[in-house]
Amino acid sequence: MSDINTTCLPAWLATCPCTGDDVNPTLTCGESLC
């Protein structure tokens, strides 16, 4: 799981900018890309 997260982080960070208040949408977007 750690390996998948490490690979996904840059991918969803580039697609979904994270704002302090947008934690839930950001996590959802990360899961979708994974």
UniProtKB/Swiss-Prot annotation:
List the propeptide region positions.
Answer: 1-10, 18-34
Q: Which InterPro entries match?
A: Amanitin/phalloidin
- Explain the post-translational modification: Processed by the macrocyclase-peptidase enzyme POPB to yield a toxic cyclic heptapeptide. POPB first removes 10 residues from the N-terminus. Conformational trapping of the remaining peptide forces the enzyme to release this intermediate rather than proceed to macrocyclization. The enzyme rebinds the remaining peptide in a different conformation and catalyzes macrocyclization of the N-terminal 7 residues.
State the source organism's domain of life: Eukaryota
Annotated crosslink 2'-cysteinyl-6'-hydroxytryptophan sulfoxide (Trp-Cys) location: W12-C16
Any one GO molecular function term: toxin activity
Q: Which UniProt keywords apply?
A: Thioether bond, Toxin
Q: List residues of cross-link (Cyclopeptide (Ala-Pro)).
A: A11-P17
For this chain, the family text in UniProt reads: Belongs to the MSDIN fungal toxin family.
Role of this protein: Toxin that belongs to the bicyclic heptapeptides called phallotoxins. Although structurally related to amatoxins, phallotoxins have a different mode of action, which is the stabilization of F-actin. Phallotoxins are poisonous when administered parenterally, but not orally because of poor absorption.
Xref: NCBIfam families: amanitin
Q: Which protein is depicted?
A: Phalloidin proprotein
